[in-house]
Amino acid sequence: MAAIKPDPNRVKEFLEQFTFDSLRMVGTLEREETNWILVKDPEGGVHRVKVGNFLGRNHGKIVDMGDTFVAVVEIVSDGTKDGWVERPRTIKLSGL
């Protein structure tokens, strides 16, 4: 099993500049047989993301979604020099 660690060579996505807690799920959308999640950033912009996209500042990868939630797994430091752990998080659907 590979060690858990963020990929330093991966190009960051737009929503990774915001803290996880500042992002809000505001809806879902199905277009061309793809299910999308609508996420609102703290500046008021609404973004279309799907499973596999990243958001938040802790390498948060979207791993699942439903009509009322987005499941994310972040990679965060475990407090040691080179140690990392996975931390599951959820964003629930909120009102506009």
Q: For each of these PLM feature ranges, what is it?
A:
Residues 1-96:
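Extended low-complexity, proline-rich intrinsically disordered regions
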